[in-house]
Amino acid sequence: MDKLVIEGGVPLTGTINVSGSKNAALPILMASILAEEPVTYTNVPRLRDIHTTNKLLSILGCPAEFEGDTVSVRPCDLKPEAPYDLVKTMRASVLCLGPLLARLGEARVALPGGCAIGARPVDLHLTALEKMGARFELEEGYIIGRCRKLKGAHIYFDFPTVGGTENLLMAATLAEGETILENAAREPEVVDLARFLIACGAKIEGHGTSVIRVQGVPRLHGCEYAIMPDRIEAGTFLVAAGITGGELLLTGCPWEELDAVIVKLNAMGMHIEKTSEGVLAKRRNGGLRGTDVTTQPFPGFPTDMQAQVMSLMCLAEGTSVVQENIFENRFMHVLELVRMGADIRISGRSAVVRGVKRLTGAPVMASDLRASASLVLAGLAARGTTHVQRIYHLDRGYERIELKLNAVGARIRREAE
């Protein structure tokens, strides 16, 4: 197991290229199951979850090959079972459920794993698929799904679930008739999935709004498709510029998709602007100021940026309040930040952050993907040395982060524990 060792206190200066989006790539790769012809993806990040997805696709009968940032998938002899050995490491693996039911009429998918950050029930997926004619039972830790042919249905989500919207969107492309997804997730990654499916021949309208309409088609063909840039990786590097007092230019950075994050960072005393070369981020003269953040579904402030911005709040003048409305138990990074000298108090789904003058390096332990990023950011700004343990979480969502940070002046290295 590896750890990161960070010598803090160095302003980061230079250019970072933003990788392809993990959260877009995972469902789009799963959608390969729907196509009857080869599919080629570019701008795919080389991450642990992507490699796991490629292995899963190969086991399901869609051999996937990775070369550079390109993944080629060749659907051939489809099989319905997603085994526990792969699914246990990644919650997104449940996204193969809808495509398998649409193509084969059956699926046997182990209950998913992934980050332990609260309840992420698959019930919303199953209830919606049942409205399309699927039947489910739980057997020895596996979701067993069967259907003759999925039928179009009017589905209302009680909450704009991203995974549920993606699963139903994929299933609906090959269903008989029209499917309407109401109170659907509007996240950019959902829009990217819809655009990919349309490129394969699907008939979809309304993606990016709360009502998506899908007219089922008999088959989907192959295509070539470029994965969108990762807005969460980009947001993490924007915070890195602010927390170290440096100046970073992000190339390939999604601008519109980061609006809620940029508004808050500018309010805290950063200057972020779009230029002809990319997105420029630096700290304004006068230091950082506290602000309040409430996580919400898109286009609100993303929960996946909450932990990183909290690290910045730790060094901002005044008091900041974070309200976490999406996931339970997503303050697991707080105790580790406190070990570094942060002043944070938790009350239910709220965290009150009182800014301090400095953070101090310490041994800390990552509990999930975004908590890992939060601790790396804190380590970059801290006085002294920070050891971030259990970075396998980090490797699930950030492509070679230590190499990218070192290239702009950070002193960070990976060591075996």
UniProtKB/Swiss-Prot annotation:
Signal peptide: none annotated. The active site is at 115 (proton donor). InterPro entries: Enolpyruvate_Tfrase_dom, Enolpyruvate_Tfrase_sf, MurA_subfamily, RNA3'P_cycl/enolpyr_Trfase_a/b, UDP_GlcNAc_COvinyl_MurA. It catalyses: phosphoenolpyruvate + UDP-N-acetyl-alpha-D-glucosamine = UDP-N-acetyl-3-O-(1-carboxyvinyl)-alpha-D-glucosamine + phosphate. UDP-N-acetyl-alpha-D-glucosamine binds at residues 91, 120-124, 304, 326. It is found in: Cytoplasm. GO terms for biological process: cell division; cell wall organization; peptidoglycan biosynthetic process; regulation of cell shape; UDP-N-acetylgalactosamine biosynthetic process. CDD domains: UdpNAET (cd01555). GO terms for molecular function: UDP-N-acetylglucosamine 1-carboxyvinyltransferase activity. Phosphoenolpyruvate binds at residues 22-23. Keywords: Cell cycle, Cell division, Cell shape, Cell wall biogenesis/degradation, Cytoplasm, Peptidoglycan synthesis, Pyruvate, Transferase. The modification 2-(S-cysteinyl)pyruvic acid O-phosphothioketal is found at residue 115. Its EC number is 2.5.1.7. Pfam families: EPSP_synthase. GO terms for cellular component: cytoplasm. It comes from the Bacteria. Pathway: Cell wall biogenesis; peptidoglycan biosynthesis. Cell wall formation. Adds enolpyruvyl to UDP-N-acetylglucosamine. Belongs to the EPSP synthase family. MurA subfamily. This is UDP-N-acetylglucosamine 1-carboxyvinyltransferase. It comes from Nitratidesulfovibrio vulgaris (strain ATCC 29579 / DSM 644 / CCUG 34227 / NCIMB 8303 / VKM B-1760 / Hildenborough). The gene is murA.
